[in-house]
Amino acid sequence: MKILIPTAKEMNTDLPSIEAIPLKPESQTVLDALALYSASQLESFYKVSAEKAAEEFQNIQALKRQTAQHYPALKLFDGLMYRNIKRDKLTEAEQDYLENHVFITSALYGVVPALSPMAPHRLDFLMKLKVAGKTLKSHWKAVYDEALKKEEVIFSLLSSEFETVFSKEIRAKMVTFKFMEDRGGQLKIHSTISKKARGAFLTALIENQVQTVGEARRLNFAGFVYREDLSQPQGLVFVKEV
């Protein structure tokens, strides 16, 4: 069983660094394509300020020169979902579960264990980077599929842009999750609710050592409970009353 989570734009490098591991050939090809951009080209590529583009340029060049600092990916990424994941003070069983079941889908690194070393970078599948004449999605599709082809159960906490990197055969095995708030009988869904809830849900999976869809349905976390009336066999809906 694998649980898939996306990367995040926000990063925290105020952490102890860890040893890097060599980039896979597929990752090196992506890095080589990114490294062709100047700082000013990155400004329009990323749609960011000149200052932010200069910072990203330095990050890319440090990776290229193999001088970049690396951190455990789960702790490096620091978006809203990540800040709601239990990342410290894990029991031995929780640490084992995290290492064996939780994987991050990255447009630079591929599908990797959540605590893999990563360097600060910015890249996602909505970005129009050409890699050896291919889109990022087509560049990664075979590698992404290979990472999951033996899995019977795949929990996806990904957004659709990441899910569509996988083939239909792999996507057919994915169990997806929606998190909603019930405000006086009105069901609301928005990105802030979803991101926080995804982090809290992953924490509940880790703490309860969940291995099956049935076990996931029984979870009660951060005020969210499973709603069978709103769910499908492979699309689980959790609702919080506010």
Swiss-Prot record:
Gene Ontology terms: biological process: response to hydroperoxide
Recorded superkingdom: Bacteria
Pfam families: H2O2_YaaD
Cellular component annotations (GO), alphabetically ordered: cytosol
Entry-linked InterPro entries: YaaA
Family per record: Belongs to the UPF0246 family.
Protein name per Swiss-Prot or TrEMBL: UPF0246 protein SPD_1378
Organism per entry: Streptococcus pneumoniae serotype 2 (strain D39 / NCTC 7466)
